[in-house]
């Protein structure tokens, strides 16, 4: 069976490991690869509901419970017409390693439903969520498998799914994360991936410049305009950077003087009503006061002028090899991914070559991979699980502080593994290899200790 997305994720991990001295120094780890690449369990189920016309509809539901050596399965639910087993296996496989880098007790999994929610009423979406959870509730629990949201599953859907679980199981427990604040959710959860991405990038800047530089005065190109992009943009602006772009599936906006926090707030409120950036730019007064250029059908990478930092926050394979070359030509020094697998293998090769072949640190381009750079969301999901188990709610300051600590610790682990197991000479260590090696060792050690590999 052809599984291109999963194969791409698997090949990326394997190439990092093969290209390091890990197997040479510790041959036993090679035995883990064929075991960890096979999910512990794949659940496929039929989901049927009545639509608003009174007709019955059916869709395929999935939960891939990939690996529980480090803790309960943890990973999002995606409701989207593109959902298939290859995509969920790719996301679940990545999730195992990403979750291990948080330092929290979480395994990896992913699930979803092959359905398009666009144009459906609130009532129908509630019926879909209840129908989906009717089957999924047999397979999850706070110590077994704790799903979260993903594409197509936001706060509203999590609410319906949680209500359905409570109804079917007669149990109020922290079985989902991303919950509402007044019924078990965590502060900073919506902001977590975007904030965490910026904290990770800040750690990259600190290391590369010996603490001499920060986001202050940096020009930052961001793609996407959803949660991750919005909160990354707001944090960059707060830290003194200039955000020169945002995008959606129909086009991008470019502002050489900088997109403002007021404009980001307008995008946030308009996106709830599924408005496109083109509509938002035409309708909101903040965009007349501070003009932006809207480019239809384009991604921002080749349209921005000089940039220091690129943060892809939209979707998979959104930066091509040619676009990566354009970013390098425009002076980009740091690239960190807010989206999963945002850069194609060709783009990653461009960034990694620019890093490895730079004659000085000033000429180098440093790439932060998604399994490390965007783990802020799942980190705060883990903190939500911790709060639920104690039936308490932490302050936003405490959650933000814990998030920052997790992102910096993750960066340091990536650096340490890259230095120990790769031969980079004077170049900046490869964070791609560092993240893959550090996370692989953590998961492998747990599997050896528990007899999953022997």
Swiss-Prot record:
Highest taxon, organism lineage: Eukaryota
List UniProt keywords, sorted A-Z: NADP, Oxidoreductase
E.C. number: 1.4.1.4
Write the protein's name: NADP-specific glutamate dehydrogenase 1
GO cellular component entries: cytosol
SUPFAM superfamilies, sorted: Aminoacid dehydrogenase-like, N-terminal domain, NAD(P)-binding Rossmann-fold domains
Protein family according to the UniProt entry: Belongs to the Glu/Leu/Phe/Val dehydrogenases family.
InterPro entries, A to Z: Aminoacid_DH-like_N_sf (IPR046346), Glu/Leu/Phe/Val/Trp_DH (IPR006095), Glu/Leu/Phe/Val/Trp_DH_C (IPR006096), Glu/Leu/Phe/Val/Trp_DH_dimer (IPR006097), Glu/Leu/Phe/Val_DH_AS (IPR033524), Glu_DH (IPR014362), Glu_Leu_Phe_Val_DH (IPR050724), NAD(P)-bd_dom_sf (IPR036291)
Q: Which GO terms describe its biological process?
A: glutamate biosynthetic process
Which residues are named in the active-site annotation?
110
Q: Which residues form a coiled coil?
A: none
Catalytic reaction(s) noted: L-glutamate + NADP(+) + H2O = 2-oxoglutarate + NH4(+) + NADPH + H(+)
Q: Signal sequence: where?
A: none
Positions that bind NAD(+) = 174-203
Complexes and interactors: Homohexamer.
Ribosomal protein keyword on record: no
Uppermost EC category = oxidoreductase
GO molecular function: any one? Answer: glutamate dehydrogenase (NADP+) activity
């Amino acid at each position: 069976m052809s599984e291109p997305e999963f194969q791409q994720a698997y090949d990326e991990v394997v190439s990092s490991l093969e290209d390091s001295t890990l197997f040479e120094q510790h041959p036993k780890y090679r035995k883990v690869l064929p075991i960890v690449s096979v999910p512990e369990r794949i659940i496929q189920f039929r989901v049927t509901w009545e639509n608003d016309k009174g007709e019955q509809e059916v869709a395929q539901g999935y939960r891939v419970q990939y690996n529980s050596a480090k803790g309960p399965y943890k990973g999002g639910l995606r409701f989207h017409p593109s959902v298939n087993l290859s995509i969920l296996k790719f996301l679940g496989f990545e999730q195992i390693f990403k979750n291990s880098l948080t330092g929290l007790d979480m395994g990896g999994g992913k699930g979803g439903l092959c359905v398009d929610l666009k144009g459906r009423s609130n009532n129908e979406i509630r019926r879909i969520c209840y129908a989906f959870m009717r089957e999924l509730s047999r397979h999850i629990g706070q110590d077994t498998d704790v799903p979260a949201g993903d594409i197509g599953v936001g706060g509203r859907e999590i609410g319906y799914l949680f209500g359905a679980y409570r109804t079917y199981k007669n149990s109020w427990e922290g079985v989902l994360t991303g919950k509402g604040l007044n019924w078990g959710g965590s502060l900073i959860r919506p902001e977590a991936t975007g904030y965490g991405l910026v904290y990770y990038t800040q750690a990259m800047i600190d290391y590369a410049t010996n603490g001499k530089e920060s986001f202050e005065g940096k020009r930052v190109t961001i793609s996407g305009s959803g949660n991750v992009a919005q909160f990354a943009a707001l944090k960059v602006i707060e830290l003194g950077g200039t955000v020169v772009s945002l995008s959606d599936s129909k086009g991008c906006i470019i502002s050489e003087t900088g997109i403002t926090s007021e404009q980001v707030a307008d995008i946030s409120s308009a996106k709830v009503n599924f408005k496109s950036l083109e509509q938002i730019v035409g309708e909101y007064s903040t965009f007349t006061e501070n003009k932006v250029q809207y480019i239809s059908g384009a991604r921002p990478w080749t349209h921005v002028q000089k940039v220091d930092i690129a943060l892809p926050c939209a979707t998979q394979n959104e930066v091509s090899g040619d676009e990566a070359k354009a970013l390098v030509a425009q002076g980009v020094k740091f690239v960190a991914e807010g989206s999963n697998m945002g850069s194609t293998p060709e783009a990653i090769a461009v960034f990694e070559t620019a890093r490895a072949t730079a004659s000085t640190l000033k000429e180098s381009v440093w790439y932060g991979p998604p399994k490390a750079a965007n783990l802020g969301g799942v980190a705060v999901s883990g903190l939500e699980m911790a709060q639920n188990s104690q039936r308490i709610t932490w302050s936003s300051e405490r959650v933000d502080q814990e998030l920052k600590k997790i992102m910096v610790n993750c960066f340091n682990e990536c650096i340490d593994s890259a230095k120990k197991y790769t031969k980079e000479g004077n170049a900046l260590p490869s964070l791609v290899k560092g993240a893959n090696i550090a996370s692989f060792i953590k998961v492998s050690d747990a599997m050896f200790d528990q007899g999953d590999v022997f």
